[in-house]
């Protein structure tokens, strides 16, 4: 189907930006970086970043300018899943067919990996190659959507 082509391309773009943006597992602190990569790479449907690309394509936006917000949204999603899988939340053992971060590593590393993914998402947006006004709008939007008025608030209601 012709509509699948852009979705596959966009998913590959996000995977490539994640691969480039995340520190290698060999970079200190190795365990933390390995956990971050475990949480984000090689799995998932990438629905949220695909929505970013799809919305941008409606306005004719060059895909290169959408890489940062699409990848930041995926990092926030990964961070939320890492924290949601913790024993204090849902205590899930598997995510995307592999052990969750707290099972594959440990709880402390999972918490730090989630926190680091959240910080990395904001850093990626802050350094995006767009004008300052747009960067601030993206940062404000991501903070609102992931904070107490959004995802964190919803999780608080869930627990």
Predicted regions and their residues:
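Mg2+-dependent prenyl diphosphate-binding active-site environment of isoprenoid biosynthetic enzymes
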Residues: 6, 22-159
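N-terminal amphipathic/basic leader segments beginning at the initiator methionine
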Residues: 1-23
């Amino acid at each position: 189907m012709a509509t699948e082509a852009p979705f596959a391309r966009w998913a590959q773009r996000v995977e490539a930006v994640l691969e480039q943006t995340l520190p290698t597992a060999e970079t200190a602190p190795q365990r933390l970086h390995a956990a971050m990569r475990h949480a984000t790479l090689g799995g998932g449907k990438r629905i949220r970043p695909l929505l970013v690309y799809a919305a941008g394509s409606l306005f004719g936006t060059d895909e290169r300018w959408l890489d940062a917000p699409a990848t930041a949204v995926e990092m926030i999603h990964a961070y939320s899943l890492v924290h949601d899988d913790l024993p204090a939340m849902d205590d899930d053992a598997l995510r995307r067919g592999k052990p969750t971060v707290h099972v594959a590593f440990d709880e402390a590393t999972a918490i730090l990996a989630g926190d680091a993914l959240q910080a990395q998402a904001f850093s990626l947006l802050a350094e995006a190659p767009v004008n300052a006004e747009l960067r601030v709008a993206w940062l404000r939007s991501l903070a609102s959507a992931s904070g107490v008025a959004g995802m964190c608030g919803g999780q608080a209601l869930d627990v």
